[in-house]
Amino acid sequence: MNGVSRLLSLALLGAALHWAPAQAEEQPRLFELLGQPGYKATWHAMFKGESDVPKWVSDASGPSSPSTSLSLEGQPYVLANSCKPHDCGNNRLLVAFRGDKSAAYGLQVSLPDEPAEVMQTPSKYATYRWYGEPSRQVRELLMKQLESDPNWK
């Protein structure tokens, strides 16, 4: 192996070793959180007293991205999301779990299929449904998460 090949091999090995831990540190997705102790019970409690909860919401059966952790007024929270399978653009769910798993709060966002302008300014056409009786601060947190989407106008 010549010097250039050895250097290239070492660079690739270094990149692979650097990449592996970053992948291992990825935060769990909503469905993975619900498999961890404490989250499932809190999840079900969030829907207590609710009627006509869509199955994709109650089952957390849609696609999701990795969760994030943050602090709100000194209290740790885990934020997660999901969307309706095959209809993510029109149906989303954002969730905030208290860090101690004592409560969960959700925001279901729904958009109509028409008019065509819906996707240009979705906030104008959205309907919101709250789960778990979130405080004003938690509502603001979940709305900020929604508004952080570059496609949300």
Swiss-Prot record:
Positions of disulphide bridges: C83-C88
Its family remark reads: Belongs to the ivy family.
Q: Name one Pfam family in it.
A: Ivy
Give the source's domain of life in one word.
Answer: Bacteria
What are the record keywords, sorted?
Disulfide bond, Periplasm, Signal
**Subcellular localization, as worded in the UniProt entry:** Periplasm
What start and end residues bound the annotated signal peptide?
1-24
Please report the name of this protein according to its UniProt entry: Inhibitor of vertebrate lysozyme
Q: How does it assemble?
A: Monomer.
Record has Disulfide bond as a keyword: yes
User: What does UniProt give as GO cellular component?
Assistant: periplasmic space
Function, in words: Strong inhibitor of lysozyme C.
Q: Which Gene3D superfamilies match?
A: Inhibitor of vertebrate lysozyme
The question of whether Nucleotide-binding is a record keyword is answered with: no
Q: Which organism is it from?
A: Pseudomonas aeruginosa (strain ATCC 15692 / DSM 22644 / CIP 104116 / JCM 14847 / LMG 12228 / 1C / PRS 101 / PAO1)
Which parts of the sequence are marked as the site Important for lysozyme inhibition?
Answer: H86
